[in-house]
Amino acid sequence: MEALKRKIAEDGIVLSDQVLKVDSFLNHQIDPVLMQQIGREFARRFEKDEITKIVTIESSGIAPAVMAGLELGVPVIFARKRKSLTLTDDLLTASVYSFTKKTESQIAISGNHLSKDDRVLIIDDFLANGQAAEGLLSIVKQAGAAVCGIGIVIEKSFQPGRDELVKKGCRVESLARIQSLEDGKVTFVQEVRS
């Protein structure tokens, strides 16, 4: 997605050869116009999949997931990382390690919101090692629902997340794929267009 790549090139800050800071438009301050374009692009890529629900993880996955849900006309469920007094019944849970925060979280979704009849699109802001996506996959499978695909805003292609998800039979659609963050510079994967 060219608009996203431009925004990353202009406003993204390379903190190391492993970490890209995009808090000025994606995961702290949100650019609503860009987020709307992201939602439309996910909807375009998954429009034929008969998606019934979108599942994401709090908090940075919520904005792109909601915009995609708006475009597809389907509800969005976000997995919570913290216990809630209201999130108690029929919990579907998984353990997730955050590459950026270097912490492990127990994520949960109420089983009341997912059923075996659902066709789910998983959306997240970043794909690095694939831990968040794998946790969400586990939760969706616990509900007996079908995973139609995984939509990623920014993929760090130099990390193993995509390969791990593809090995599990997942379709992964990333809007911007980063080949490298070496020497303080963002280099994108050159996609072959068919």
From Swiss-Prot:
| Keyword Transcription regulation attributed | no
Q: Which Pfam families match?
A: Pribosyltran (PF00156)
Record carries keyword Transferase: yes
UniProt keywords (A-Z) are: Cytoplasm, Glycosyltransferase, Purine salvage, Transferase
- Top-rank taxon, per record: Bacteria
- Cellular location of this protein? Cytoplasm
- What metabolic or biological pathway is this protein involved in? Purine metabolism; XMP biosynthesis via salvage pathway; XMP from xanthine: step 1/1
Which purpose does this protein serve, as stated in its record? Converts the preformed base xanthine, a product of nucleic acid breakdown, to xanthosine 5'-monophosphate (XMP), so it can be reused for RNA or DNA synthesis.
- What protein family does this chain belong to? Belongs to the purine/pyrimidine phosphoribosyltransferase family. Xpt subfamily.
Complex formation:
Homodimer.
Q: What's this protein's name?
A: Xanthine phosphoribosyltransferase
Q: Which organism is it from?
A: Bacillus velezensis (strain DSM 23117 / BGSC 10A6 / LMG 26770 / FZB42) (Bacillus amyloliquefaciens subsp. plantarum)
Give the gene name: xpt
